[in-house]
């Protein structure tokens, strides 16, 4: 057994000077938080402790989290609670739609925890919520950010078909954008995204474009988990090969000591290089910077 002197001491990197969190009016921040609690809804802004949530709240925007606040997976980077998911709130879609109405939103982002416990992996959560929002105003633009919808069935072919069927249900509602995040490069997938798979995620984005060519597709990756520049470029090229239209690239920030450590803080000039790299490849929208998250400045 190792003694304290022999135990490996983890190196924790200091937050660099270029990472500065936006400050917003406390009144606006508290107003949005009160609405979220009163409405009995969840947002990824709160559950994921997003560094931009004060700024987004000040502008009256939020990304709604469907399926409760407990995720059936345990990704090593994510702040969202993990464990046995709660029972589905049958009023959730109505409550989210009411919040959209109160906030007078014109562009809404819907995401969800992974619900591997449900036969449809949560696809109908998106369908019902989109329908409720459209009852309020059919002109509201809706972006969806889904899990990989992978699972069930005995063979790969079964799982592949189920994924496509679940995806088709969502895309039939005609969201303006379909988003699914790769999160990291292929080599680090197993360590970072437990229960997920790089090829399954690329396949989901490819299926989305095949099913609904006119719907914009989008994906995001985090930097600072031990990836190399070459691996990032390869990931970006993989997204371009499946005709992904939009991309977000941001710095991974460790939520707590229980989560994966930050291996590197990428400098602003490196983000600028990657933004240029993506733009030259023809991505229609590129958001790239230390505090960029997949739903930041969406729309």
Swiss-Prot record:
Top-level lineage group: Bacteria
PROSITE patterns: RADICAL_SAM (PS51918)
Main location: cytoplasm
Pathway recorded for this protein: Protein modification; protein lipoylation via endogenous pathway; protein N(6)-(lipoyl)lysine from octanoyl-[acyl-carrier-protein]: step 2/2
InterPro entries associated with the record: Aldolase_TIM, Elp3/MiaA/NifB-like_rSAM, LIAS_N, Lipoyl_synth, rSAM
Pfam families in the cross-refs: LIAS_N, Radical_SAM
Catalytic activity, EC: 2.8.1.8
Listed SMART domains: Elp3 (SM00729)
Domain Radical SAM core: 57-284
Amino acids binding [4Fe-4S] cluster 2: 71, 75, 78
Cofactor: [4Fe-4S] cluster
UniProt key word S-adenosyl-L-methionine: yes
Keyword Transferase (UniProt): yes
GO molecular function: 4 iron, 4 sulfur cluster binding; lipoate synthase activity; metal ion binding
Location of this chain's protein in the cell: Cytoplasm
Keywords: 4Fe-4S, Cytoplasm, Iron, Iron-sulfur, Metal-binding, S-adenosyl-L-methionine, Transferase
Gene3D superfamilies reported in the protein's UniProt record: Aldolase class I (3.20.20.70)
Binding site for [4Fe-4S] cluster 1: 45, 50, 56, 295
Chemical reaction(s) catalysed: [[Fe-S] cluster scaffold protein carrying a second [4Fe-4S](2+) cluster] + N(6)-octanoyl-L-lysyl-[protein] + 2 oxidized [2Fe-2S]-[ferredoxin] + 2 S-adenosyl-L-methionine + 4 H(+) = [[Fe-S] cluster scaffold protein] + N(6)-[(R)-dihydrolipoyl]-L-lysyl-[protein] + 4 Fe(3+) + 2 hydrogen sulfide + 2 5'-deoxyadenosine + 2 L-methionine + 2 reduced [2Fe-2S]-[ferredoxin]
NCBIfam families: lipA, PRK05481.1, PRK12928.1
UniProt-listed HAMAP family: Lipoyl_synth
Similarity remark: Belongs to the radical SAM superfamily. Lipoyl synthase family.
Protein name: Lipoyl synthase 2
Organism: Prochlorococcus marinus subsp. pastoris (strain CCMP1986 / NIES-2087 / MED4)
Gene name tied to this protein: lipA2
